[in-house]
Amino acid sequence: MYICNCSYTSKLKAVFFFGLILSLCCACSRAGARRVSSYDHYWVKAADERVEADRKWADYLFNHLDRRTGSRSVALRQKPVQGTFLQIVVHVDAKGKHDYSTVLDGDVLRLTACDEDKMLWLIYQFLASGEDPRIESSDLPPAMIDIAHAEGDFAFEYRGIYSPSNADPELMPVTASHHVDYDWGLWGHNLRRVFPGEVPEEALAWVDGQRDENQFCFSSEQLFKAVEAYVTDNYGETGGVRFAIMPNDNSAVCACKACTAAGNTRKVATPSVSRFIRRLAERYPHHLFFTSSYRTTEVPPAEPLPQNAGVIISAMDLPLRPDFAGKRPAENFSRKVKEWRKVVSRIYVWDYMRNFDDYFTPYPCLGVLSERLRYFYSLGVKGLFYNGSGYDYASFDDLQTAALACMLINPDLPLESYTERYLKRFYPHASDILLPAYLSWERIVKEREALLPFYGGIADAVSAWLDPVEFGAFCDRLDGCAKRTDGMERRRLNELLTALQFTRLELLRMPAGAYDERKADLYLEALYGYTAFSGMKNYREAFGSVQSYLEEWNILKTENRESQNPLKGIRLSCQPAEDENAASLPVLTDGLYALPSDYHTGWFIASSRRFVLQVPPGKISDGAVLELSLLYAPAWHIFLPASVEVWQGEGKMASFGLPPVGEKEVFSKQRVSCKLETVNPDIPVELRFMQVAAARASVACDEIKVY
């Protein structure tokens, strides 16, 4: 039984003494038991040959044992006539006390599960247990239970992981995990899919006196009939499929007469959306329908919804760091969950397991995720969706996905032990290098109570856990080991090492770091090997082409090589001094440029409506040309300034001519310059910036140069 081993539940104290006695008794009863591997044969038997499910799964276990032992008559469906044997009794019991149990009693091992899905998982726990070397299990993640004696309930009914290591539909049942691309009829903001052609006008929201093609009217009968046809035609009436019914991802709310009468306001669409979901839930009582606590549907409905309705709540505002419980974000999240529990029977949480700006730098998140899962369980959350890197490679994703699949069954999984068993199974030669490194990163995150950002740069990793010198030594040791391995381990290591070159390149780009073009060339050459791996085209969620990154780096090397700047090392000042990024002023004169695709590293970013950068007296001569390197990235609210003027004292000296930029441009670097004819060497030179009139506008500059 999963009992949360933390302060979130009062069950622990009540069962502690009983559990201690029980475990001691079990230990005594097993002390004389034989190991599974000590038997000549396995006699696989259905608990009741008259029950179809028992026969089916006994046959399944027999067939897979026969295949994985090489058909050496190790597995039998009839009682062996000679030799020692372990009888394995398979039983599907919907009325059992727990979701699963395994009991080794003498020479009989009983495998019991409450349904067929869990029986399949339990069979693979036996096959992956590693008890018998005759059973080939090198392709299976290590078992998470003691196959001789285990019983328990799955902590969560839905266990979704959106990661490349969970993308094989044949492996998902083995790990008892889910994937939104396979087990949801509708997921996310994809309601548009119910219309095979154009969305009819009557199904569109009425916003500011006209139809809005970017939002739906949830009082529309045409919308309801389209969803009804989609559900019936694709999934029937009895399947128990999950559907997410969400408005499009914007702030528009339908204000037609019907939606307004339902209770919609200018910012809240909950009344019309919840009424729509109620109709669907009543129409299809065997399917599950979910709304989202997000943007226009963040607040719960006033009245409870049917039992087959639920809500998906994002954990984006819950920082991914240790010891988060009891702090304000957790209190706010708990309050939201409790409010929704009053009106729905199912609460699923959309949580996150990656830095979406950097998939390649290791992200030691397992300890924090374990803590979060115990917290979610204590709140009565019934399902989790973990947003990972989708189908794109992420460093250590194989280990983390396997461990997370186990933690979604039991959040109290002993992480260090499981990590050790996983790495020794899949990296037998390199585990002595990988294991201490990975566990040390997890421990550092815990000790520092470090924040693991959902969107962050290399400086965030260094702040949280990464020691640049030790990391470089780790990569070198791992590279040496990889050259002595072969087969699948060699391929896995090559893929990991290729990704880690990205991290080494990012460390070279850090302000006040150790930029070295010779090392950059070595790391770039290794990163070009990404083409050998189908999942390594992108290093981040959006605009993350590895090929584009490599091309930007080649430009960057040229920029840095040509950066002969009299201002190099000169400290500028900024007004207002309280600007949130004043500490990054040194990047403006460090002689190192930044990448336009990454605003995290190497950029001075200012969001004040007006701000002034001041160059000390005597640093700019008559006739000098002053050059600014600016970032234009409107998707990140970074724009070219409306104006930049150069002043000394009360006199304006010059203005920078700012180029037009394409509205559809994602990001680009723009260099602008102006000539200063006469400069007073006794007075500072001021660069006065004015922001454009845009919401949350910022200006970013990576270098100020004089020539």
Short names for language-model regions:
Residues 35-45, 52, 57-60, 64, ...:
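Feature activates predominantly on carbohydrate-active enzymes
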